[in-house]
């Protein structure tokens, strides 16, 4: 029994049975140990950013951590952007990184780096066992740290000699992380929130811990009883949506519009969320989105029991059941492909219980409204703003769930983690990839104006346009073993979506869109 086998045995004892891996030399004993770990599903990813994003997606749909397997500091660096998204999503994730042998580090070999410093920037705990005998206990501590609350990215750095070294006396029972319950909200804050909801113009602001159907139902009851509007953060980790589900008002992404959206509020009650702030700074636009006379009540910030907070407010307000708004999904569209017809096609065809991994960016401007009364589904969004999340998260969601996953990908973002297509094909995952190809970084056209950057000459245009050459997304998909279709009309898109949903395994649909949104 060596350190690597001890790590795997402890993972299995704690229910961590999926590993998204891009291994190197330092991880070979872990890889070898997988041959005997029949309870573990090991998934090869061709780029570390796919592995980390897949672990994020898996956690979003299961509520449980998957593990990554990364190679030294550069492997961690390659996967860091999607670990950042996982940090912002507040999902549990066990980030396993192989390191040089403990005695080799002092020689400053080419791949030597300060792994703990890079991992520490994720704001989660970092564990570094120095003996094979320490691996099991440190792994259990890391898994406990991943669960939180709040959930976090927990990193375990495994030196090569600790991995291959023998455990002198394996434990009779592998250590199991003790679960920790989220603290309940402060009674005084509950009373304050209830009083202000009754007496001031208010909103309940829901974060990712409060976006299940049952908790949004409670929020709807509170809103109906108090007159407060129910809002949701711009980019929730996972959100139940569709017909029969409460539809909170989504905070607008653009800061100046979000400021106007919140301007008349005197109270903002936070449930599972932090206070909203601008995504970026802009000239003459405040970073803080609520007005100066708005009282923000942090009733249940991340890590505090959001369900208990909502239930307490229901009791305080004696809030009766409230009707859920009803409506119908759009009809299948025809005619030209536009951002509106694309959104309508998704809404009209979406199968029940689908999972929507949404990195449509500017091309998805109509998506939230169009899918309000689509078939019930789960929405996964770009929590941390680091693009290249949609395809990897779709991989993890498909492995963690039996539902059809629909990955909506803008063309620029797709090129960050294109290797995820290969993993979809190899694992035969039921993922429909919809590439929204407007052939430019369209968001930057808009942002250039917003920040007051002048000029639109040839040099700046070359940094925003995705042409010369035009990317053949269908060709790229086929090269990785995925059937692909290029559509020309909205009717074609509807047909292609329906065929995809009826066919096992992955497929890709390329949707050409106008460059302006």
Question: How would you label these PLM feature ranges?
Answer:
Residues 2, 133, 157, 171, ...:
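Phosphate/pyrophosphate-binding active-site segments
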Residues 1-320, 431-433:
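N-terminal alpha/beta PP-like core and its mobile active-site loop of ThDP/TPP-dependent enzymes
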Residues 96, 104-113, 225, 366-517:
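Thiamine diphosphate
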């Amino acid at each position: 029994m060596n350190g690597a086998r001890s790590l795997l045995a402890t993972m299995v004892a704690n229910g961590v049975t999926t590993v998204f891996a891009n291994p190197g030399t330092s991880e070979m004993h872990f890889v070898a140990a997988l041959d005997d770990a029949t309870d573990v599903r090991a998934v090869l990813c061709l780029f570390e950013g796919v592995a980390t994003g897949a672990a994020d997606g898996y956690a979003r749909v299961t509520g449980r951590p998957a593990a990554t397997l990364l190679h030294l500091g550069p492997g961690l660096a390659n996967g860091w952007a999607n670990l950042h998204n996982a940090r912002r999503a507040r999902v549990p994730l066990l980030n396993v990184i192989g390191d040089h042998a403990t005695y080799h580090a002092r020689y400053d070999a080419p791949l030597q780096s300060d792994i703990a410093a890079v991992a520490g920037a994720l704001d989660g705990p970092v564990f570094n066992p120095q003996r094979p005998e320490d691996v099991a206990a440190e792994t259990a501590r890391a898994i406990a740290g991943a669960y939180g609350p709040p959930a976090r990215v927990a990193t375990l750095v495994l030196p090569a000699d600790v991995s291959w070294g023998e455990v002198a006396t394996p434990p009779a029972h592998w250590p199991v992380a003790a679960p920790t319950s989220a603290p309940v909200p402060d009674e005084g804050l509950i009373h304050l929130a209830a009083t202000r909801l009754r007496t001031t113009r208010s909103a309940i602001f829901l974060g990712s811990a409060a976006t299940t159907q049952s908790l949004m139902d409670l929020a709807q009851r509170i809103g109906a009883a108090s007159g407060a509007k129910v809002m949701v953060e711009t980019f929730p980790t996972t959100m139940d949506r569709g017909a029969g589900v409460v539809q909170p008002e989504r905070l607008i992404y653009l800061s100046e519009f979000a400021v106007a959206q919140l301007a008349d509020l005197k109270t903002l009650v936070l449930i599972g969320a932090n206070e909203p702030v601008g995504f970026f700074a802009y000239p003459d636009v405040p970073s803080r989105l609520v007005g100066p006379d708005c009282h923000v009540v942090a009733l249940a910030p991340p890590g505090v029991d959001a369900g208990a907070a909502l239930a307490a407010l229901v009791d305080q307000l004696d809030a009766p059941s409230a009707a859920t708004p009803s409506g119908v999904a759009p009809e299948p569209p025809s005619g030209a492909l536009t951002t509106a017809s694309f959104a309508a096609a998704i809404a009209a065809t979406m199968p029940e219980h689908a999972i929507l991994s949404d990195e449509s960016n500017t091309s998805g401007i109509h998506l939230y409204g169009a899918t309000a009364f689509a078939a019930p589904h789960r929405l996964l969004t770009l929590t941390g703003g680091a693009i290249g999340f949609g395809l990897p998260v779709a991989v993890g969601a498909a492995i963690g769930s039996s539902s059809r996953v629909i990955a909506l990908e803008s063309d620029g973002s797709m090129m960050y983690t294109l290797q995820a297509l290969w993993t979809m094909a190899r694992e035969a995952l039921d993922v429909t990839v919809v590439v929204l190809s407007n052939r430019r970084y369209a968001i930057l056209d808009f942002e250039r104006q917003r920040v007051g950057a002048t000029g639109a000459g040839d040099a700046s245009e070359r940094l925003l346009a995705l042409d010369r050459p035009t990317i053949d997304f269908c060709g790229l998909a086929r090269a990785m073993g995925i059937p692909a279709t290029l559509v020309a009309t909205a009717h074609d898109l509807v047909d292609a979506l329906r065929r995809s949903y009826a066919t096992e395994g992955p497929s890709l649909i390329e949707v050409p869109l106008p460059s302006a949104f």
